[in-house]
């Protein structure tokens, strides 16, 4: 995966989905802008220790990520056609396992790319534009303009099932983040269904590949 794509995904998608300003009445552009600002402040403040304190990143993600993302909608998208035939218990388990996996992925990304994110925050520029809003769905474009790299557009997909906006997905250069997970899990989903993927994700976590325990940042 190109470094430009990874950096863009980390700066925009992670920081948007890992922060929460989803108060009632907050519009989609304001939500995304404030979320990115809050996320950049967090990384800038703790950049020197994030790589050595995975529990700090985990705590940040746990505090914000689960509140802003709709885990069921994300799980349905990743599961694709295999969601419809799965029993309720399998759906619940898959949703929980996938969410834990995403937390681990985002925690690792924020820790690994913290220096690059700080560099971007210091020298780059970010623009925000509402691309589409139709009833309870909206797309906000985050234009990342690094000083010495090509510009990257990240589209944040939101929906409003109730009184506040939630992040559904993010597209970097037209590529959906959740679609990457769906593609990766598709062979096992076809063979073993949601239960098989849940087994694999849980084994990965118990083997040490999952997110660490939470702890306050120093």
Per-segment meaning from a language model:
Residues 1-9:
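Bacterial N-terminal signal peptides that target proteins for export
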Residues 8-17:
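Bacterial N-terminal signal peptides
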Residues 18-24:
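Sec/Tat signal peptide C-region and signal peptidase I cleavage site
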Residues 26-110:
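Early exported N-terminus immediately downstream of N-terminal targeting peptides
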Residues 83, 100-101, 146, 173-177:
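Solvent-exposed loop/turn segments at secondary-structure junctions
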Residues 93-152, 204-218:
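Surface-exposed, charged secondary-structure patches
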Residues 151-180:
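Short beta-strand edge/turn micro-motifs at domain boundaries
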Residues 174-218:
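Non-transmembrane domains of secretory- and envelope-associated proteins
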């Amino acid at each position: 995966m190109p470094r430009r794509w990874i950096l863009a995904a980390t700066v925009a998608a992670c920081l948007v989905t890992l922060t929460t300003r989803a108060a009632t009445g907050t519009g989609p552009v304001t939500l995304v802008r404030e979320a990115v600002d809050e996320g950049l402040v967090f990384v800038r403040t703790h950049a020197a220790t994030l790589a050595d304190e995975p529990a700090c990143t985990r705590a940040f993600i746990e505090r914000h990520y689960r509140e802003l993302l709709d885990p069921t909608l994300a799980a349905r998208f990743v599961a694709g056609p295999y969601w419809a035939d799965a029993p309720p218990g399998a759906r619940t388990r898959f949703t929980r396992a996938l969410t834990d996996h995403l937390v681990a992925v985002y925690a690792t990304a924020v820790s690994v790319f913290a220096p690059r994110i700080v560099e971007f925050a210091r020298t780059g520029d970010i623009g925000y534009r509402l691309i589409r809003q139709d009833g309870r769905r909206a797309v906000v474009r985050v234009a990342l303009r690094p000083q010495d790299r090509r510009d990257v557009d990240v589209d944040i997909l939101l929906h409003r099932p109730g009184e506040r906006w939630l992040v559904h997905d993010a597209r970097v250069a037209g590529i959906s983040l959740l679609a990457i997970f769906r593609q990766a899990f598709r062979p096992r989903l076809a063979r073993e269904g949601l239960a098989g993927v849940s087994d694999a994700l849980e084994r990965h976590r118990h083997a040490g590949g999952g997110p660490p325990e939470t702890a306050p940042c120093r």
